[in-house]
Amino acid sequence: MNQNLSITASLLGDPGRAAMLLRLMGGIALPAGELAVTANVAPQTASEHLAKLVEGRLLSVERQGRHRYYRLASVEVADAVEALLVLTAHPRTAGLGSASSKAIVGSLEHARTCYGHLAGWLGVRITESLEKRGLIKEYGAKAYSLTASGREWFETIGVGVPSSAIAQKKLARRCLDWTERRHHLAGRLGCAMYKRFRELRWVVPVRDSRVIRVSVEGRAQLWKLLRVPLG
């Protein structure tokens, strides 16, 4: 077990590999070429990094024609990366000098995706509002339970929750946000909510980024339904 921990730690400790993992936290699959650009390494070096991450079970790979697409191997990997981010220095104190870098960090802090669900300030505020209204409740250290009124609320916005899914532990998970240091809603319910917000065009993902923009309609609806202040 100690040896496995040491191997995983060494995989995460390389800046290039860490950059690749962070790029894939949005729950997407990307080809080696894009991940090489993300890590700022040569294609051959990227291939070596990716092979190690696949061997270490941090990434999975799928072949489509001539290309290979890489994604995080599991939600547990995403949780581990998020947990490590919580332990690292806050991005505002990490020595980011350029105005563009600071703008990107600010956008990520405000609203971003985390393996298919909403994170950052927006994700945390939505979660806190759901709790305050009794729509979800803490269920142990790692989960939320969906209340009867919560199930009705989600159905009103178009997120159906089958009775068989309510008791499942992975329906609504608590994910510690690395920028807010508080929990946001993850799991199948968190992913379904984000997907529905996208369908309604309340939130719009920024191309080639984990950053999320909230539309004018989204601002109005999130205030109306959850009293989330977005200006």
Q: What is the predicted function of each stretch?
A:
Residues Q3, G26, D79-Y139, I157-R207, ...:
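Amphipathic alpha-helical dimerization/coiled-coil segments
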Residues Q3-A42, R68-Y70, V105, T113-C114:
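N-terminal helix-turn-helix DNA-binding core of bacterial DNA-binding proteins
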Residues A32-L59:
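Canonical helix-turn-helix DNA-binding module
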Residues V54-Q64, R71, Y139-G140, V206-R207:
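Beta-hairpin "wing" of winged helix-turn-helix
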Residues E62-T88, L146, G150-W153, G218:
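Basic, amphipathic "hinge/linker" alpha-helix immediately C-terminal to the N-terminal HTH DNA-binding motif
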Residues E217-G231:
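Short terminal or interdomain "cap/linker" segment that borders an active site or interface and mediates
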